[in-house]
Design a protein with these regions (language model features):
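Conserved, mostly hydrophobic/aromatic
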Residues: 13, 67, 113, 230
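A short alpha/beta connector and helix-capping loop motif
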Residues: 18-50, 127
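Acidic (Asp/Glu)-rich catalytic clusters
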Residues: 27-31, 52-65, 104-106, 138
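Glycine-rich tight-turn/loop motif centered on a GG-T
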Residues: 36-43, 74-89, 183-194
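Catalytic beta/alpha-barrel core
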Residues: 38-43, 122-125, 143-152
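C-terminal helical cap(s) of enzyme catalytic domains, especially alpha/beta-barrels
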Residues: 57, 206, 237-249
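Glycine/small-residue-rich loop that forms an oxyanion/phosphate-binding "nest" at active or ligand-binding sites
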Residues: 73-112
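Active-site rim beta-loop-alpha module in soluble metabolic enzymes
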Residues: 151-212
Length: 249
């Protein structure tokens, strides 16, 4: 939570309900995480949901991050929408501004941006999209950080981010297998996701204590880690988050 001095913090996608449709167990999970990635209306969420999510995060002293995505409610932001770089900048500003308004109304602020779904993946694949997102954040508030996937290319991303005066946060997915080059194993492969909770928890503890994860072939991957992503869409995920938090803290 805010002010926590632990090396690794837990982040979770939240505030993804829409109207009468409910997604996730936000009220149950919020007390067990450190950073909440709040949807901003394009892939999920709405005005009332954003307002309630900000109130809930502040109540639990959880750091608030904007979780902007492509304008794709039907696809939940998991499909790439072809956009110009100016459009990318604009959709980031639009969503960041919306969430920031609710934060300001409740005496808090957006601390970082973590793009959602396809936009996150496209940012990591395309340097121009990465730059467009940095440009948007920098023009809005240079104190807001950008969360990206930790990889072997951290140094290059860091160099680019510095030219926009933006600080990066490095994220690791404990429940995903990694290739030897530090990239995530594609979800097209059946072994992309680690389903054994005890194995995932062991990986998180190993990452915290020794600073590395084992790749799918057993190679040590030393990944800079500011935060670990956890998911909270169902009751099983909620119980899992509690186990991870107990192991780390």
């Amino acid at each position: 939570m805010q002010g926590n001095e632990m090396k690794i913090r837990l982040n979770c996608d939240m505030g993804e309900s829409f109207g009468i449709w409910k997604m996730g167990l936000d009220e149950q999970i919020m007390p067990y995480i450190d950073m909440a990635n709040l949807a901003c209306g394009f892939h999920a969420s709405d005005a009332m949901t954003m307002n309630k999510s900000v109130i809930l995060a502040k109540k639990n002293n959880v750091t608030i991050g904007a979780h902007p995505g492509y304008q794709d409610l039907l696809g939940f932001g998991r499909r790439t929408i072809i956009c110009s770089l100016e459009e990318i900048k604009s959709i980031i500003l639009y969503q960041l501004g919306a969430l920031s308004a609710f934060c300001k109304a409740h005496g808090t602020a957006v601390s970082y941006v973590k793009p959602h779904g396809a936009l996150y993946n496209d940012m990591m694949r395309d340097e121009n999209i990465f730059k467009a997102i940095l440009n948007a954040i920098s023009s809005f508030d240079k104190n807001i950080k950008l969360m990206i996937l930790s990889s072997a290319k951290n140094e290059a991303y860091e160099h680019t981010a510095k030219s926009y005066s933006i600080t990066l946060l490095y994220e690791v997915f404990a429940d995903r297998n990694y290739n030897d080059d530090g990239t995530l194993v594609s979800r097209m492969h059946e072994n992309a996701v680690i389903s054994d909770d005890l194995e995932v928890i062991s990986r998180v503890i190993n990452l915290k204590d020794k600073g590395f994860l084992n790749s799918i072939n057993g190679q040590k991957l030393f990944l800079k880690t500011d935060t670990v992503c956890v998911h909270g869409d169902n009751e099983k995920a909620f119980e899992f988050i509690k186990l991870i938090r107990k192991a780390l803290y």
